[in-house]
Amino acid sequence: MLLLKCQLASDMGCIRTNNEDMILFNGGLYRDETYEQKFELIPQARFTAFVADGMGGHEGGEFASELATQAFDRFITDLPCGLSHEVLSGEIKNWVNETHALITNKGVELPQYEGMGTTFVGMFSYEESIYMVNIGDSRLYRYRGGILKRLSSDHSMRELTGDMTTPSNVIYNSLGAGTSAFADFTELTGQLLDEDLFLICSDGLSDMLTDDQIEEVLQREPTAVSYTHLRAHETEA
């Protein structure tokens, strides 16, 4: 049984006039708000913690991130019990394809949303195991023993080519945009320690603060309330 202490926060930031991020946390969707919860994760329980960062201009990004988080919430709720890792991996692939098609088709049906898409990254529990799903360039970090480690990979042209002159926000994989999408799917169960702190964020944070700066903040305040300090540093950056 795991004791989880969670804090989530969604903030428009200092530049944009709308917030295209959406948080999925244990069946709830959150945008432009903060929320805290402490609970025990009992065996067989389904737990979700994800961030989706929409793109598409106007309100397209907001709509895409909402569609993706709603779709995954339905997926995890309806997922049958007793699936093997291999079968679960196949179900994740099916969900990615279906959700990509859903968002793409909505963009065709509603011209104001044409070309919209979203990243999607986070963790979920299933059958006493913890898994990571990653699509795009939003990030999942683990902080342990004073060291911050990025667990997700950016599906960006910069990371793919190693060319640092390429803008960091040029991505080649997302739900809705492009001809297809894929997900990195990884089991984390054997890598978990009681002391671990996980940070899930969009590029609204990771583009403003380096990994070293995030690590420095967490070293001073290694608890969920670190969000306040991270947000302050982001504003100063």
Where are the predicted features?
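PP2C/PPM-type serine/threonine phosphatase catalytic domain
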Residues: 1-231
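A short, hydrophobic C-terminal helix/tail in secreted or cell-surface proteins
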Residues: 232-237
